[in-house]
Amino acid sequence: MNKRVKIVATLGPAVEIRGGKKYGEDGYWSGKLDVEASAKNIAKLIEAGANTFRFNFSHGDHQEQGDRMATVKLAEKLAGKKVGFLLDTKGPEIRTELFEGDAKEYSYTTGEKIRVATKQGIQSTREVIALNVAGSLDIYDDVEVGRQVLIDDGKLGLRVVAKDDVTREFEVEVENDGVIAKQKGVNIPNTKIPFPALAERDNDDIRFGLEQGINFIAISFVRTAKDVEEVRAICKETGNGHVQLFAKIENQQGIDNLDEIIEAADGIMIARGDMGIEVPYEMVPVYQKMIIKKVNAAGKVVITATNMLETMTEKPRATRSEVSDVFNAVIDGTDATMLSGESANGKYPLESVTTMATIDKNAQTLLSEYGRLNSDSFERNSKTEVMASAVKDATNSMDIKLIVTLTKTGHTARLISKYRPNADILALTFDELTERGLMLNWGVIPMLTDAPSSTDDMFEIAERKAVEAGLVQSGDDIVIVAGVPVGEAVRTNTMRIRTVR
């Protein structure tokens, strides 16, 4: 059995060699990126189980991210496997501003009072922390006295105790000992801020990524379907309508509008980091299960992300609770699990991917016993959906080793994946964009092939490719799903059970 749960690994300096130095060594950032050496490290991640690489545009410029993407393309050749490319937008963030002078961070003690400035374009001092707000918004009028301001994923909490209408600054009280560093994320829970749907930087980043040939875009802080539609318009305008859009759900507004967002997007990323700050933390696992269930029913891809193996950023082994977290996400029905800092800037990127792959593969063997996905409740509202359901029934009733589907758009493979059949899904397609677009679907092994010349040729190709890929051998039973007659614009209408010769 192959690993059916997909892994998204975030790339960063952890796997990159610069000037002969590894990340963390003196002089690392002054060196030039060694593409070949870095590609060898990334190839190891692919071999360990990474299916798609995430490029986090909250960090780095176009030059850095472009070099990173080029390195992955070389790594694909070294590993002999293709992967997906996912661009994650910075989104409408609030961050602490740059500091005056040479200061790197300021320390504070509980009960201390300082001020927070909302005026844009100024630098921070120890007494007045300035905020950099997406869209250059002045959020003074949006934040009420009594609200909490959380710095760096909640590591430092501030409470607004007064507002100064003259300076348009908040007086805040420090709630715990800690530090404030420059350019750290800021969250203000239970506060609606009128961010633009798409910041100018995000627009530029998306267009750059499309030029590089990305396959997926994760849209940060999605609040309504309109946020997704704006990005979709850019993709279509530039001739990239095939690029799949993942809405990141990370605040209460996104949760409240979840149904319309699922309908508008191609998939959902459960971004638990900011979600755990923006909503009560005890609700995060509740929302995770709810989101996975809804996305499963819609037949779309769901990625569970953030802090999954956080300990492995610094240590070579995951905690028992982290192992349970990854396991339970798979049991809940996630299509993919994601590594963030673990693979981007951690000390053990390869071990993190290997560990996640091991947990994912173990969990998938227990889906029939413990899995929460109930495909019996899915609406079968098309011939293809009925066919996908029948394929699952066949794998449950017989010892089917493999499902092979010939698909032009990937639609049939996605529907079969939706039902979580008890066999791998080999998706043979004639379009490389479709091949890469299936990199995140549960259980799907996408592969490029020549278009068949006839129906008989189609079945021969399906069997031959399955054998060549090492997925089956003589005597194994396989299910082949396709639309016939070949060459005509027909939907999937044929399912054949065939014994490999």
Per-range role (PLM):
Residues 1-501:
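Non-catalytic helical/linker scaffolds that mediate oligomerization, partner binding
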